[in-house]
Amino acid sequence: MYSSSRKRCPKTKWALKLLTAAFLAASPAAKSAVNNAYDALIIEARKGNTQPALSWFALKSALSNNQIADWLQIALWAGQDKQVITVYNRYRHQQLPARGYAAVAVAYRNLQQWQNSLTLWQKALSLEPQNKDYQRGQILTLADAGHYDTALVKLKQLNSGAPDKANLLAEAYIYKLAGRHQDELRAMTESLPENASTQQYPTEYVQALRNNQLAAAIDDANLTPDIRADIHAELVRLSFMPTRSESERYAIADRALAQYAALEILWHDNPDRTAQYQRIQVDHLGALLTRDRYKDVISHYQRLKKTGQIIPPWGQYWVASAYLKDHQPKKAQSIMTELFYHKETIAPDLSDEELADLFYSHLESENYPGALTVTQHTINTSPPFLRLMGTPTSIPNDTWLQGHSFLSTVAKYSNDLPQAEMTARELAYNAPGNQGLRIDYASVLQARGWPRAAENELKKAEVIEPRNINLEVEQAWTALTLQEWQQAAVLTHDVVEREPQDPGVVRLKRAVDVHNLAELRIAGSTGIDAEGPDSGKHDVDLTTIVYSPPLKDNWRGFAGFGYADGQFSEGKGIVRDWLAGVEWRSRNIWLEAEYAERVFNHEHKPGARLSGWYDFNDNWRIGSQLERLSHRVPLRAMKNGVTGNSAQAYVRWYQNERRKYGVSWAFTDFSDSNQRHEVSLEGQERIWSSPYLIVDFLPSLYYEQNTEHDTPYYNPIKTFDIVPAFEASHLLWRSYENSWEQIFSAGVGASWQKHYGTDVVTQLGYGQRISWNDVIDAGATLRWEKRPYDGDREHNLYVEFDMTFRF
């Protein structure tokens, strides 16, 4: 496989040093005090004078296990690999310390007996499984044996737990043996100290430059314009390669940006450097993209287009990626479709990153067929597992996992959340060590309205990499839903400090900033053509409330105004309310206390309200409301001087976004001695969902009874309504946080009233709703209803409206 000269050639010397240096510090004898002749021999051996110790060991017939391990290590230091093997074979049945087996493993490796070396590494690791030096020794030997993929997998596992420069050097060594010289150069570049000069370059880095045809970069005097452009291009390419952290990628990109700035000054007005100047202009797009400067990428691209410069495919891909990150998915989709489709078929050689960008360019452009095409292509062309060369071990195929992750995401965006959940759960539980899949699963649970279940899954994911950016972003979203305001703020502050340009972080920060704004709520209705006895003709009902920004996380103050009027046979009724109060929001709890000055019939009377709810879990909620001078008293009653106090309680059961039911009971004690009891049951059953259309069945039952009969307001002795309805929500347009939809509703049922029998109830409604930039949510609905009142069917045509505005 490899010639024996590789044993001592320069390209492997540093790997050998990496191991033996670790073993020098591992000898327990070296840690003891100099208190006898044996210790003195060991210390001399550590200084390089190994012969006295080796002679002493050779003359001894009885040695302890620790002394045997010392012999093996010192023989290794002396370069006597065969002697190490001979000593080991003599004592192989002894239970040696791990350092002894490690010394033998190094000796076998030096003799190119890879399998024997791997066996000894396994013995050493069985005794000290967390020893990073032994793990690296095994990894380097796997690379020597040609098992590059296995070595890289193990190195990735080691690096996730203990990233350091030694791991980068090991990575470069593996890539060098595998012939992947660009990856080798990337790893060596990352291992360099910042601002290293050419005189300080280590031998391995110089060799990596040579392997990448960049040897001239070693000598500044040999830097021709073409070579300088090559170096700039190579730095840009390296900045896109996966590394241990974003900061390393940024550091490489910053080197490229600094080189561009210098070369741009030199070549801008030099006609002899036109070709090289155009090259660095294109490569500059990539460096800006790595640095998350998406708007700069786009503006630089537009300047190049104006000059007529031709942009090669890789440059166009960088621009498309910038458009996608800058929330311009249709432009990204247009460029990527040209690049990655050939006669409506996806190119077969796309990387995982290219597939992901193509997928999201379709998805975020609301092109669901295109997203499904990419998904099916990814799944159909990728086996679930990859078998590593030269070993029976197989590992999960990241591309296959990505394809099924696409499947879950498409289902989620297509409003098929059960399918999204099933796919995401299967992926997460079949790959428990994959943190990204666990985070995706939690995101689907959150979308289904189960934030506590999502929180539990994120806790499991936290074990793998606690400070993963995507993990903390998802945890912050869950905290916002659970009203854990302080936790959300801490997580958001952390990710903003670390990755301020990350699109997920930008989106989260926007949500937290909006949460901290003041809020205006307006809601009401106005009658157009009404015959009903409750609200009168041409009635108006309006409530306006302003909430303060959050105070000490959980508190908000509010103040507002309410107005209601209606025309009755006995005259016009008008009620004005001036109100103020406080709101408390914390995990599982919402409370609101309000004081109101109610003005009607030329009188001022104090009213009050206390409302609240408590969540037991993701499924069950109980709530209650107590009100003095209740708004449950009809306007007509107040016109006639009748007021009342009320109490209400309810229970809500929420299975998921497709099914929920609520039961409520209300009691109103009128000032004219009437007592009203109301019980209602309302539910929702989703019967159809697609990307743009959702249809729900809305069953509704209502029962009411009153103790007084002869009153100036509508007051049936007993009444019972059954009015099932359907509601269809049709998405007209959507772009990220902005949307516009229309809502149709229709219901037909029956109403029974004591002494008046049963008659038909019909309802129709049409409305539109718009959401904009997270700060505006507004809608209006035209409703028509016809129902019996004391045996006469009367109609009511009115408009409902509401708006929430953050400022």
Swiss-Prot record:
GO molecular function: poly-beta-1,6-N-acetyl-D-glucosamine transmembrane transporter activity; polysaccharide transmembrane transporter activity
Recorded superkingdom: Bacteria
Name the record gives this protein: Poly-beta-1,6-N-acetyl-D-glucosamine export protein
PROSITE patterns in the record: TPR, TPR_REGION
Disruption phenotype: Deletion of pgaA does not prevent PGA synthesis but does block its export. The synthesized PGA is retained in the periplasm and accumulates at the cell poles. Disruption of the pga operon causes severe and persistent defects in the biofilm formation process.
Main location: membrane
Keywords: Cell outer membrane, Membrane, Repeat, Signal, TPR repeat, Transmembrane, Transmembrane beta strand, Transport
Species name: Escherichia coli (strain K12)
A single BP term in Gene Ontology: single-species biofilm formation
Annotated TM spans: none
Keyword Translocase in annotation: no
Protein purpose: Exports the biofilm adhesin polysaccharide poly-beta-1,6-N-acetyl-D-glucosamine (PGA) across the outer membrane. The PGA transported seems to be partially N-deacetylated since N-deacetylation of PGA by PgaB is needed for PGA export through the PgaA porin. Required for the synthesis of the beta-1,6-GlcNAc polysaccharide (PGA or poly-GlcNAc) that seems to serve as a biofilm adhesin.
